[in-house]
């Protein structure tokens, strides 16, 4: 069955016209789905009864099912189950009157970064558009009942967004457009490990979302040790694509940098990173490593973290130290799913 959350409004209009219905019915349907968050056609009372029945027969309105919720302070992590029984994770961070949802785009991940829990079991499959949008609708419904709503969406959960390009871009359009969830493009961030051709392609879209790039090292030798795909898309090519995106969209690019003790957190690494990014339209997010038992790394010492940050700041680079809100609830990417798979005997 066709899930309603996979369609944009023009596609719904075309279907309705094929049924002999006026196209404005699409606006009414989407008002119920995205504004009132009603996922039951029988409750769409301004539609003719016959049309409601036809919609129910043609479309499904399913969203992912909640398996488990863990919470710590202002962070909630949702372990979700999809229709085929696969599991993904979604995180809600509520902070200073903002509600940020972190969504997954794949079941697992094929990149195999040597510090990330998501890639431990590889890639199962891409998420469909409705499975991405469904995560956001799930959280929006929960907040809506409290008189609140989502303010930001970040594509930073499980999987590499640019390796599920079409479904991710369509989901962004659905949540961004006025007929959808109407979340502004400056409040949507896509995070990528650095799939260079797709960064250029994204720059040509009419989206202008914020771009975050997982850099994690100041040179190719170090980066290739923890990010295998760096051998295909080395840092110099990655930076070229990032600066192109910034110029094309007018959006400053964020570089994510996970600090790993005695690997990429030394003074010389900070100086080298500053040399790459100085006088560029960028922001750097420093992230203390969130421990994953399967990897040997340790979190950097605080004194080294602050020294690293100061070197970047002194070079005139905008830099933020990201607080790890979800470390105790295993809210690092893929950690809750990994624990769940272990409990089922699917991960050693």
UniProtKB/Swiss-Prot annotation:
Gene3D superfamilies assigned: 1.10.150.530, Aldolase class I
GO cellular component, one term: cytoplasm
Cofactor: [4Fe-4S] cluster
Subcellular location: Cytoplasm
MF terms (GO), sorted A to Z: 4 iron, 4 sulfur cluster binding; metal ion binding; rRNA (adenine(2503)-C2-)-methyltransferase activity; rRNA binding; tRNA (adenine(37)-C2)-methyltransferase activity; tRNA binding
Residues reported in the UniProt entry to bind [4Fe-4S] cluster: 109, 113, 116
EC number, as in UniProt: 2.1.1.192
UniProt cofactor note: Binds 1 [4Fe-4S] cluster. The cluster is coordinated with 3 cysteines and an exchangeable S-adenosyl-L-methionine.
Catalysis performed (reactions): adenosine(2503) in 23S rRNA + 2 reduced [2Fe-2S]-[ferredoxin] + 2 S-adenosyl-L-methionine = 2-methyladenosine(2503) in 23S rRNA + 5'-deoxyadenosine + L-methionine + 2 oxidized [2Fe-2S]-[ferredoxin] + S-adenosyl-L-homocysteine; adenosine(37) in tRNA + 2 reduced [2Fe-2S]-[ferredoxin] + 2 S-adenosyl-L-methionine = 2-methyladenosine(37) in tRNA + 5'-deoxyadenosine + L-methionine + 2 oxidized [2Fe-2S]-[ferredoxin] + S-adenosyl-L-homocysteine
Ranges for domain Radical SAM core: 95-328
Bridged cysteine pairs (disulfide): 102-333
UniProt-annotated catalytic positions: 89, 333
PANTHER family: 23S RRNA METHYLTRANSFERASE (PTHR30544), RADICAL SAM CORE DOMAIN-CONTAINING PROTEIN (PTHR30544:SF5)
HAMAP family: RNA_methyltr_RlmN
Purpose: Specifically methylates position 2 of adenine 2503 in 23S rRNA and position 2 of adenine 37 in tRNAs.
Record's miscellaneous remark: Reaction proceeds by a ping-pong mechanism involving intermediate methylation of a conserved cysteine residue.
Name this protein carries in UniProt: Probable dual-specificity RNA methyltransferase RlmN
Organism ancestry: Bacteria, Pseudomonadati, Dictyoglomota, Dictyoglomia, Dictyoglomales
């Amino acid at each position: 069955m066709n899930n309603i959350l996979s369609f944009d409004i023009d596609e719904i209009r075309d279907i309705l016209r094929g049924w002999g219905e006026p196209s404005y019915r699409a606006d009414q349907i989407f008002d119920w789905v995205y504004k009132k968050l009603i996922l039951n056609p029988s409750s769409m009372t301004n539609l003719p009864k016959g049309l409601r029945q036809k919609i129910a027969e043609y479309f499904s309105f399913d969203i992912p099912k909640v398996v488990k919720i863990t919470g710590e302070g202002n962070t909630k992590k949702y372990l979700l189950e999809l229709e085929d029984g696969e599991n993904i994770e979604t995180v809600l961070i509520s902070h200073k009157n903002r509600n940020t949802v972190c969504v997954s785009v794949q079941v697992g991940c094929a990149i195999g970064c040597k510090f990330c829990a998501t890639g431990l079991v590889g890639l199962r499959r891409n998420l469909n558009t409705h499975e991405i949008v469904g995560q956001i609708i799930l959280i929006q419904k929960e907040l809506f009942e409290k008189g609140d709503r989502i303010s930001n969406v970040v594509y930073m959960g499980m999987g590499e967004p640019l390796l599920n390009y079409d479904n991710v871009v369509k989901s962004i359009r659905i949540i961004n457009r006025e007929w959808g969830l109407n979340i502004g493009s400056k409040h949507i961030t896509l995070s990528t490990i650095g799939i260079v051709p797709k960064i250029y392609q994204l720059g040509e879209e009419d989206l202008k979302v914020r771009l975050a790039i997982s850099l994690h090292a100041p040179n190719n030798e170090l980066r290739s040790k923890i990010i295998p795909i760096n051998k295909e898309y080395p840092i110099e090519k990655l930076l070229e694509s990032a600066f192109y995106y910034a110029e094309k969209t007018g959006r400053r690019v964020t570089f994510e940098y996970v600090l790993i003790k005695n690997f990429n957190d030394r003074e010389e690494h900070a100086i080298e990173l500053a040399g790459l990014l100085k006088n560029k339209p960028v922001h750097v997010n420093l992230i203390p490593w969130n421990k994953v038992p399967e990897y040997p790394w340790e979190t950097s010492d605080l004194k080294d973290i602050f020294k690293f940050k100061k070197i970047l700041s002194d070079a005139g680079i905008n830099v933020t130290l990201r607080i790890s809100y979800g470390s105790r609830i295993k809210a690092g990417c893929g950690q809750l799913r990994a624990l769940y798979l272990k409990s089922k005997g699917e991960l050693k």
